[in-house]
C-alpha cells in the first residue's frame, strides 16, 4: 500500500514520448507536475497566497525557471560548488513561461502567485523550455487557482519546405526557423522566433501549425486535471462600485480627453499627473479615498478614450494614422574611438548603439546544461531610467533588458558573416537614451548600422518595427510603430524584424482571446510595409558596409600551421607564446586544427609575430640557403642555427674549398654565416655547406686570427635565398 496517490498521463507527441505525473513529489505545493520528454525531466510547482496584501495594486506573479547541474551529471564550478544567480538562459526561459500565463489570471485577482520550475534531468538533444512551459501550465491547472488555462506550447522548425514539431537540437541545426508558440485551446497568446529571412506566409503558417499541434498537450493536461485536479478556489472579483466609478468618470473624462490631444509625451504625462492629483483632491474633500481604486478607474477611462479614438478612425495619440512610422533620423560614426557606432532616432525613441570587434579570446563561454559552447556574437540592451524622464535604480540588467537584448540578437544573427569569412567576435551594446515605445526595434536598426559602421560584412540591412492591435468585437485596428501608451492600452503587441527579403525575428504577446488568423495576416502585412519604409531610411543613411575597419579596431590575420607544430609555438609552460605576445604586442590564438589567429592594432607587430611563428614552424628545405649564427664549434665542424629550434651540422670539409685544419681559424661562436642545406635525414638531422653557399652567391672565406671573415662580392640582403 503506497502513501502516494499518483496520477500519470502519457502520450506520443510528434517523435517524442511524453509523460506527465503528479501526486508523489512536492505534495505541499498548490500544484506540482513532473513532465518527462525523452529523458528531459522538469518539475513545475505553483503556490498562491489565499488573500491579496492590503493596498496591492498589481498582480504579483513570479516565474522562476531553475537549471540544476546534476541534471546533466555535472558538479557546479566556482568556490562554493553550488548553483548561483540565474543565468541569462534561465532568465529568458522564465520570461518565456511568464508571458502566456499572465493574461489568463482573472482581472482583480491580486493574490501572490509563485511558479517555480526545476530541470531535474536533461537529454542534450531535447531542449527543456517546452517541457518547462507544459509543466508550469499543468501545475496551475491542477491547483484550483483561478486561471483560464491550461496553456499548451510547441516548438516549430522549418526545413525543406516542411514544418517540424518540437525538433531536437540536431534537427534545429539545419532548420531555417526556431519558433515557439504558446496558447490556449482557442487562441494563440505568445510567439517567440528566429528565422532565416522567411516570408510572412511561412511564419503565419508556423504559428497556426504550432497551435494545432499543441492541442495534444492541452488535452493531456485536461485529462490530468479531471483525475487529480484540486477543487477550484471559491474566488470572485470584488463587485465594482458603479456610483464611485460614475463619480470619478464625471470628474476625469473630459480633462483626460483633452490631455490625449497633447502630442508630445512629456507634456502629456505632466498633464495626466496633474489631472490625477486634481481628481484625488476633489474626492478627498468628501472623505478617505482608495488611491489604488481611483488609479484603476482612471486607467480604464484612458483606455476607453484612446481605443475609441483609434477604432473611430481618429488620429492616434501623437497625431499619426494607423500606418505611419514616426520620423526617423540616423547618424553613423558618432563616437570617435569606438569601432562602430550609430544613433538611431524614431520619434521620441532613441538608441545609441556601439559595435566592438574582438578576437576569439573575447567570445563568451557559456556553460549550459547541454554542454559548454562559445558565442562570438553578443548583444546587450540597457535602458536607464533617464530614458523615460524618471529616477530609478542603475545597475545589473533586469529581466526586461535581458529579453530585449536577446530579441535584437535573434533579429541580427541571420545576416552575420560566418566565422570563416569574418573571424572577429562582435559585441553590440544598445544604450536607450530616449524611450516612447519600440526601443527593442530601434536597437535592431541601430545594431545593424553600428556593425556596418564597424566594417562587419552583414548580408543585408535589418530593420524592426513594433506593432499594436485594438480589438473590440468585430472591429479592429492594427497600429504601426506603437508608442508606449498604445502598447500599454492595446490588446496585442508584436515586434517584427527582418530584411527586404523576409523576417528574421518575430515576437508576439496577445492579451485577449479572439485574435484570428485573418487579423494576424493583416498585422503581418502592415508590419512588412512599415519595415520596408524603415529599411529605405537606413539605406539612405548607410548604403553599404564600410570597407575599412576603424583605426582603433584590432587587425587580424589567420593562417594554418601543422597541428604537430602547435607545441613548438606554445613552448614549455607557454613560454614561447607568452614571449611572442609580450614582444610583439599581439594577441595570438591557436586552435587544435592548427589555425593561428593574430590580432593587433599594429600592422608591424602583427607581421613580426606571423614571421616568427612561421619561422618556428617552418620545415627546412634542401637546396635553400639560410643565414644563422654559429652556436657551437666542434673538432669536426660547427653547429649552425638556421631556423628557430633547428641546428644543422656544418662539417669541416664544407667550410672552404681549401683544406681547413682548425675550425676556429675560420669560424667563431656567434658569427652569422650563410649556409646551404645539403640534406636532411629521417631523424631530422641537417647537413650544411658554407662553401656551397659561397659558390651559389659568390664570395670567399679566408682564415683570420681568432675568427674568419666572410668576404661577399655582392652578398644578398639578410633573409633572401638563392
Curated annotation (Swiss-Prot):
SUPFAM superfamilies to which the protein is assigned, alphabetical: Eukaryotic type KH-domain (KH-domain type I), Nucleic acid-binding proteins, Polynucleotide phosphorylase/guanosine pentaphosphate synthase (PNPase/GPSI), domain 3, Ribonuclease PH domain 2-like, Ribosomal protein S5 domain 2-like
GO molecular function (one): magnesium ion binding
- Note the SS bond partners: none
Residue ranges annotated for the KH domain, each copy included: 554-613
Query: Which GO annotations describe the biological process of this protein?
Result: mRNA catabolic process; RNA processing
Determine if Electron transport is one of this entry's keywords. no
Q: Which Pfam families match?
A: KH_1, PNPase, RNase_PH, RNase_PH_C, S1
Task: Report the locations given in the UniProt record.
Answer: Cytoplasm
The residues the record assigns to binding Mg(2+) are 487, 493
Reaction(s) catalysed (UniProt annotation): RNA(n+1) + phosphate = RNA(n) + a ribonucleoside 5'-diphosphate
**Principal location:** cytoplasm
Q: Tell me yes or no: is Metal-binding among this UniProt entry's keywords.
A: yes
> PROSITE patterns this protein is in?
KH_TYPE_1, S1
Q: Which UniProt keywords apply?
A: Cytoplasm, Magnesium, Metal-binding, Nucleotidyltransferase, RNA-binding, Transferase
- Say which domain of life the source belongs to: Bacteria
- EC number, as in UniProt: 2.7.7.8
Question: Which NCBIfam families does UniProt cross-reference here?
Answer: polynuc_phos, PRK11824.1
**PANTHER family noted in UniProt:** POLYRIBONUCLEOTIDE NUCLEOTIDYLTRANSFERASE, POLYRIBONUCLEOTIDE NUCLEOTIDYLTRANSFERASE 1, MITOCHONDRIAL
What the protein does comes down to:
Involved in mRNA degradation. Catalyzes the phosphorolysis of single-stranded polyribonucleotides processively in the 3'- to 5'-direction.
Q: What is this protein called?
A: Polyribonucleotide nucleotidyltransferase
- Primary gene name: pnp
